[in-house]
From Swiss-Prot:
InterPro entries with a match to the protein in the record: Diketo_gul_Rdtase, Mal/L-sulf/L-lact_DH-like_ah, Mal/L-sulf/L-lact_DH-like_NADP, Mal/L-sulfo/L-lacto_DH-like_sf, Malate/L-lactate_DH-like
Alphabetical UniProt keywords: Cytoplasm, NAD, Oxidoreductase
Similarity section: Belongs to the LDH2/MDH2 oxidoreductase family. DlgD subfamily.
Gene Ontology MF terms: 3-dehydro-L-gulonate 2-dehydrogenase activity; NAD+ binding
Domain of life: Bacteria
Gene that produces this protein: dlgD
Organism: Escherichia fergusonii (strain ATCC 35469 / DSM 13698 / CCUG 18766 / IAM 14443 / JCM 21226 / LMG 7866 / NBRC 102419 / NCTC 12128 / CDC 0568-73)
Enzyme class: oxidoreductase
Listed Gene3D superfamilies: 1.10.1530.10, Hypothetical oxidoreductase yiak, domain 2 (3.30.1370.60), Hypothetical oxidoreductase yiak, domain 3 (3.30.60.50)
NAD is among the record's keywords: yes
Catalytic activity: 3-dehydro-L-gulonate + NAD(+) = 2,3-dioxo-L-gulonate + NADH + H(+); 3-dehydro-L-gulonate + NADP(+) = 2,3-dioxo-L-gulonate + NADPH + H(+)
Name recorded for this polypeptide: 2,3-diketo-L-gulonate reductase
Organismal lineage: Bacteria, Pseudomonadati, Pseudomonadota, Gammaproteobacteria, Enterobacterales
Disulfide bond in keyword set: no
Annotated binding of NAD(+), by residue: 168-174, 224-225, 304-306
Amino acid sequence: MKVSFEQLKAAFNRVLLSRGVAVETADACAEMFARTTESGVYSHGVNRFPRFIQQLDNGDIIPDAEAKRITTLGAIEQWDAQRSIGNLTAKKMMDRAIELAADHGIGLVALRNANHWMRGGSYGWQAAEKGYIGICWTNSIAVMPPWGAKECRIGTNPLIVAIPSTPITMVDMSMSMFSYGMLEVNRLAGRQLPVDGGFDDEGNLTKEPGVIEKNRRILPMGYWKGSGMSIVLDMIATLLSDGASVAEVTQDNSDEYGVSQIFIAIEVDKLIDGPTRDAKLQRIMDYVTTAERADENQAIRLPGHEFTTLLAENRRNGITVDDSVWAKIQAL
């Protein structure tokens, strides 16, 4: 089905207000969920909203909590999210990293005791729109087996890197081949995954999203490489924030809350003049996209460039929402 941005935001807002969330907070949170969905990231927008409300109802998310600064060390700051709303707090933390970068050339905010930030790419994009390089990542509950294991002991720990090119170039990727959100998107659409995304119950690689969702044997990105990246990203976020690791979140909490996150902004213009920056970025993009195609019908893509097209299509034609997901939201 198709819905407008206004319908989507109103639906989110209604549910949030019914839970006693303050009017201004509910409006800002509903706006972010709707913008994420409008941008084409359904997995971490509309599809994720019922799960967000479940955690709100369970008390994992404290809607009136505010992040609190703990430590300042020049360009580095450490904050405690105090289990506030994840996407609103993440936006504030990247804003703060940008402010630090304006003063120091680089800014780093390490956040502990945070909630799921929904679409991580929103915060990298936020920095790149202002002319900064944006880098951020989060740890999570253990939802992926380390390479060579059957049991989930590491997080998908998504990493975002956004570059202020025209259009913005951005990698937004979990350390698994697919996020659980994208497994859901493909299952709801009745599609197999384009490449292997995990293991079946017999230990064979599979493209069936529903099987992987059920047995939780998701495949690390690049096999042992994604497994290793997940571990070191967790270590850095834990140390810099003095927060909880994947092990602590998984073993000590009843659900995925109290995670650790990193937000970095770099002011490129302190290092290179604008025309030179733009020319260098354009040369990189042209060099990549003019490579001989392996398939004449398949364009060579640059990461993140599709979001501009998806946003325009959704604004023109309406936002696609799965019927079953919309029914869940209406029932909340």
